[in-house]
From Swiss-Prot:
It comes from Chlamydia trachomatis serovar L2 (strain ATCC VR-902B / DSM 19102 / 434/Bu). Pfam families: Chlam_OMP3. GO terms for biological process: regulation of cell shape. One of its GO terms (cellular component) is cell outer membrane. This is Small cysteine-rich outer membrane protein OmcA. The keyword Magnesium does not apply. Part of a disulfide cross-linked outer membrane complex (COMC) composed of the major outer membrane porin (MOMP), the small cysteine-rich protein (OmcA) and the large cysteine-rich periplasmic protein (OmcB). InterPro entries: Cys-rich_OMP3_Chlamydia (IPR003517). It is found in: Cell outer membrane. A lipid is attached at C19 (N-palmitoyl cysteine). The lineage of its organism: Bacteria, Pseudomonadati, Chlamydiota, Chlamydiia, Chlamydiales.
């Protein structure tokens, strides 16, 4: 019982410290096409793991990758500042 409680506490601390900024940005990938919403897709696909980010990993492809070629890409597509910081 103690191990379970300790593991749950550890998971919540680690996930909060590592994912707060991602959660604040609603899992938005600044380089993703405007019509893509990683946040919405991950809300529906919860893996139940020890990770408040639900396993979301930002896209590895550079801005303007091979998907949705006609969509606007880049931080400015989501009105994100050039420095990449989240809007408050």
């Amino acid at each position: 019982m103690k191990k379970t409680a300790l593991l749950a506490a550890l998971c919540s601390v680690v996930s909060l410290s590592s994912c707060c900024r991602i959660v604040d940005c609603c899992f938005e990938d600044p380089c993703a096409p405007i019509q893509c919403s990683p946040c919405e897709s991950k809300k529906k696909d919860v893996d139940g793991g020890c990770n408040s980010c639900n396993g979301y990993v930002p896209a590895c492809k550079p801005c303007g990758g091979d998907t949705h070629q006609d969509a606007e890409h880049g931080p400015q597509a989501r009105e994100i500042p050039v420095d990449g910081k989240c809007r408050q």
